Amino acid sequence: MKVWIVEDINDETVVAQTATVAYNICRKSILENEDDDEAAGEFLNELAHSYSDSRASFGVEGVIWARAMDVISE
C-alpha cells in the first residue's frame, strides 16, 4: 500500500482521507474474513498501527477503529 504525503493540506483533511481509505480496506477485509473474527481483528490492529506510525498519525488510529466498528455493526 502506498501512502501519499501532501504538504499543503491540513491535518483534519489527512485524517479524513486516511480514515476513508482505512474504512474501505477494513470493510473488504471483514467481508473476506467474516467467518474469522480473529483474522479480521488482527488485520484491523495491524492497519491501525501502520497508520499511527505514519506521518499522518493525528488521531488516525482511533478514527480507524471507530470506522471499523461501524463496518462490523452493519
Predicted regions and their residues:
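Conserved aromatic
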Residues: 16-20, 34
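Short aromatic-glycine-(Arg/Gly/Cys) micro-motifs in beta-strand/loop hairpins
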Residues: 1-12
